[in-house]
């Protein structure tokens, strides 16, 4: 399938798309007459595959989104490709600009039903590059893996419903040009960085998340339309700049008590925190002179207050919130 869109006026736009059995591509250009700007872009996906399954009741999503879900609407779709490449070249008043983004095997899965909404994205072997020849800048970063997932309830129900979210980024590398912007003296280890976290929990929704009152009010407090029953930090990992931080925890909430912790239901549970390499990291920050000495000293004092040393530059802390709202760190009461 081949299609072309052209628009002319104060600006000229042309977009051409091609969809075939082996992949897909989109390319086009933009030229503004009022500003000396020209832009060309292209996005190509190889070995593109997609599939979808849906069940549609008599009431459509367009007619009544919430009622359609209640009546049994469901849809699942999957989208994969082996490689992709996006490139953008622009001529601006300040000089030329080039952007590129490439990925290896990638996939996107979505599902929608009365159970809620689910989305998962996975990308491997990705690389992002920005080139500004007029300034002599050529920035590049790449990562081995980047995946995210989210599942959330949508409809109001009397019983509890599950939610969850996860992010996994591994093998992140920065080019020397980009690294030198904040560490020109190479004081920090530049090993590949990684970050991972996963949360899950349960809630009771007194009002569906698809209601107009919620969608139109972006500043609405989530506790105004539901209750949080349980929250679990299943995993947290940050490994970068020579420091490794790991954490996990689990809490339950008493929605009849908003006074012990003003404005939120009273939590009860435990959490643990482990930090490796913090002293060496703070020493390097001090040598870089990016923070005032008072801030550095404050960070050391805070760590000494809530953490205990368990090995060579390893700190550990166990946190607890009891049923009376008392907060402890390693058995020492903080609140």
Q: What residue spans do the PLM features occupy?
A:
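Glycine-rich, small/hydroxylated-residue low-complexity segments
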Residues: 1-335
